[in-house]
Amino acid sequence: MGMTSDTIADLLTRIRNALKAEHLYVDLEHSKMREAIVKILKQHGFLAHYLIKEEHRKRTMRIFLQYTNDRKPVIRQLKRVSKPSRRVYVPAAKIPYVFGNMGISVLSTSQGVLDGSTARAKNIGGELLCLVW
């Protein structure tokens, strides 16, 4: 697929496909934004862990996927909200609660990439990047 114009959608698609294929991990090009999103997913138990590798001045990320004891993906759904063609911004009060609060929203804010509950607590809105549950 190469570098698409929407690296976040690409990240979510690659994770989705890897989970469908029951892969242990997925490798992709590193970016600060991608790492920030992956870090939040890991903090919330949606991903096992990740590594950043540097080879020939190229940084790649290896994301280790998380499965339940009976080998089902922990992530049910990854949904891109804001897109390069149609940006979606929300104030703190409009940050969605996801999947009966078992899921998370990820926002790009003036204070960096945050999960919805953190942004809500800080009373800051931002660009609604994606929903995960």
Curated annotation (Swiss-Prot):
Domain of life per record: Bacteria
Segments crossing the lipid bilayer: none
PROSITE patterns: RIBOSOMAL_S8
Single GO BP term: translation
Cellular component per GO, a single term: ribonucleoprotein complex
InterPro entries: Ribosomal_uS8, Ribosomal_uS8_CS, Ribosomal_uS8_sf
The keyword Ribonucleoprotein belongs to this UniProt entry's keyword annotation: yes
UniProt keyword annotations, A-Z: Ribonucleoprotein, Ribosomal protein, RNA-binding, rRNA-binding
A Gene Ontology molecular function term of the record: structural constituent of ribosome
Family of this protein: Belongs to the universal ribosomal protein uS8 family.
Its biological purpose: One of the primary rRNA binding proteins, it binds directly to 16S rRNA central domain where it helps coordinate assembly of the platform of the 30S subunit.
Subunit structure: Part of the 30S ribosomal subunit. Contacts proteins S5 and S12.
Protein name: Small ribosomal subunit protein uS8
